[in-house]
């Protein structure tokens, strides 16, 4: 849903047409805020319930303050001990900071989160930006989008400098730590960039 939102924001709302939806889950697009964000009129009616502890609708983040608010709203959704919630908060913060600091995404990052009764949470962060390959190729040579993703997952690799270990402000360790945290916890994260896909 975040990817649809990010892509949709690149299109003039006058050029977006929404056909009559037949799916029983059509209210989900309204409830998660997709149609409102894209300024698409909807005649879908539903009973709105408090989202607390279940989901966070699509949220557009362009500043550190907006990121802090999102993470604050996200913590109750996690249903975790404070230490575990802090780790997830770090991951989301690091990924969104990558968008804010590196991607030059005009619309910032688009996030949403959903908690499932099976004790699973899905968090999606999307943007329409330069892409990892363009950013990494400022300092390194990646032949493909997948090569760029693989480089970005190595510690000390950042698109801001070729200096080993990055810089004081940007050590190039965020994605490496996130990959490691996911691996240790037997979780996973997915990166799509250009034509590259990593899971």
Where are these regions (language model features)?
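Conserved ATP-binding N-box helix of the HATPase_c
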Residues: 5-7, 82-116, 175-182
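Short beta-strand element(s) in the Bergerat
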Residues: 119-123
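Intrinsically disordered, low-complexity linker/loop segments enriched in Gly/Pro
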Residues: 57-85
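Internal, well-ordered alpha/beta segment that forms a basic, Gly-enriched binding/recognition surface
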Residues: 36, 42-67
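Flexible ATP-lid and adjacent glycine-rich G1/G2 motifs of the Bergerat
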Residues: 138-197
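Glycine-rich G1-box
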Residues: 130
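Acidic ATP/Mg2+-coordinating residue in the GHKL
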Residues: 127
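Amphipathic alpha-helical interaction surfaces in cytosolic regulatory modules
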Residues: 1-39
């Amino acid at each position: 849903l975040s990817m649809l939102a990010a892509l949709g924001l690149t299109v003039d709302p006058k050029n977006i047409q929404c056909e009559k939806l037949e799916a029983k889950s059509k209210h989900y697009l309204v409830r998660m805020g997709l149609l409102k964000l894209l300024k698409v009129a909807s005649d879908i009616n539903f009973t709105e319930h408090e989202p607390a502890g279940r989901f966070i609708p699509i949220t557009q983040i362009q500043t550190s303050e907006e990121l802090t608010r999102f993470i604050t709203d996200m913590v109750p959704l996690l249903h975790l001990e404070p230490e575990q919630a802090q780790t997830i908060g770090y991951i989301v913060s690091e990924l969104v900071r990558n968008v804010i600091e590196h991607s030059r995404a005009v619309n910032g990052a688009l996030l949403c989160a959903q908690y499932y009764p099976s004790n699973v949470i899905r968090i999606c962060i999307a943007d329409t930006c330069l892409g990892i390959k363009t950013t990494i190729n400022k300092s390194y040579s990646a032949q493909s989008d997948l090569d760029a993703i693989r480089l970005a997952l190595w510690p000390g690799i950042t698109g801001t400098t070729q200096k080993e270990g990055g810089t004081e402000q940007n050590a190039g360790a965020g994605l490496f730590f996130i990959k490691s945290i996911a691996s240790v916890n037997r979780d996973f994260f997915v990166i799509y960039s250009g034509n590259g896909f990593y899971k």
